[in-house]
Amino acid sequence: MACVFPCQQGIVVGGGLAGMSAANTLLENGAKTVLIDKSSFCGGNSTKATSGINGSATRSQKNKGIEDSAQLFTADTLKGGAKRPELAELLCVNSGPDVEWLMDKFNLDLSLVARLGGHSAPRTHRGKERFPGMTITYALIQMVEKISEK
């Protein structure tokens, strides 16, 4: 996000997890916010995520005795696909704090941690709900609606 707070206004394109995170941050900091999505309802592909959300060095991992780091996550990420080390590192360094932000800010249960393909440590977080992507995204949508009503 190019805006440095205090920011008076912002436009968010996309109503998935990233867009809703941006919209929540803008609204929470008092910015007038316009959210644009190509669909008639928000959520995007994020609502379809059935495995969970990846994060390294989180409280949930530490509570389960799982050793992980942003460096290990970055190495795993760079093993596949296009090589953009600076973007992979940015993603992985922020992944743990982002998962914890979701848990703390939106009171989400992301305490279950699994090791999925391509990962050398368990780092895919989810709660007890059947569809974690939908649960996470809807929590952010509800908060945007709540803040917008004020």
Indicate where each model-derived feature is located.
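N-terminal Rossmann-like FAD-binding beta1-loop-alpha1 element of flavoenzymes
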Residues: 8-35
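A short, basic/flexible loop-to-alpha-helix module at the beginning of a structural domain
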Residues: 1-7
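Short, well-ordered alpha-helix to beta-strand connector turns
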Residues: 7-8, 50
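Conserved N-terminal/central alpha/beta ligand/cofactor-binding core
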Residues: 2, 31-32, 38-150
